Design a protein with these regions (language model features):
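C-terminal accessory helical subdomains adjacent to catalytic cores in phosphodiester-
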Residues: 1-6, 18-48, 54-189
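Short hydrophobic beta-strand that contains or immediately precedes a catalytic carboxylate
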Residues: 9-12
């Protein structure tokens, strides 16, 4: 049974202190992307805690080079929070591009990265997915247990699989879903 990383997910936060890996793993397991063979016990998804946003931005070019060197269908996903200083995902993506370009990453290589940016935090998405509402102008409530995190991720996967329109989604969730769909469409080619 092959065991190979197909999706590398960089995220903010410290190991053991972030809900991001729980949400990421539950979401990707439930989505079952066709290009990532999710065998039982395989490590096709690798989450990498990067601390704060500056560290995440600095680490991304090296991880992208690693993914490109692995070849095949290895995908780099970057999960981050859109804090008060970032209006939308495109502005934060531009900060990543500035650093990547300085590190010798081409635009074509950069465009292979899937960016997933939650405003104000991932907890806002979880609040929306579990209750149907959230206010992205404030931080969503902190979560102490993994069960609601995994349940929200599975709810999002179900909406993605069913092709449910993302109207009504918080703006950052709709933006991130479009990025996922672009990856999915690219992998079908």
């Amino acid at each position: 049974m092959p065991s190979r990383t197909h999706i590398v997910c960089l995220h903010e936060g410290a190991k053991g202190r972030s809900i991001d890996p729980v949400f990421i793993n539950a979401l990707l397991k439930a989505l079952k992307p066709a290009w990532a063979q999710l065998w039982k016990g395989s490590n096709v998804v690798r989450t990498v805690p990067c601390g704060g946003r500056s560290n995440l931005i600095a680490q991304m070019p090296g991880e992208l080079r690693n993914c490109l060197a692995m070849g095949a269908d290895t995908t780099l996903m970057v999960w981050a929070d859109l804090d008060d200083d970032m209006e939308d995902g495109e502005k934060l993506k531009e900060r990543f591009w500035t650093t990547a370009k300085q590190e010798g990453i081409t635009k074509e290589q950069f465009e292979q990265v899937v960016f997933v940016f939650a405003k104000d935090r991932l907890e806002n998405w979880i609040e929306f997915l579990l209750t149907g509402k959230t206010d992205e102008s404030r931080e969503g409530p902190r979560l102490k247990h993994n069960e609601p995190v995994a349940r929200a991720a599975k709810e999002l996967a179900e909406r993605c699989r069913s092709g449910a329109a993302d109207s009504g989604f918080p703006s950052s969730l709709a933006w991130s879903c479009r990025n996922w769909r672009a990856l999915r469409d690219r992998m079908k080619k």
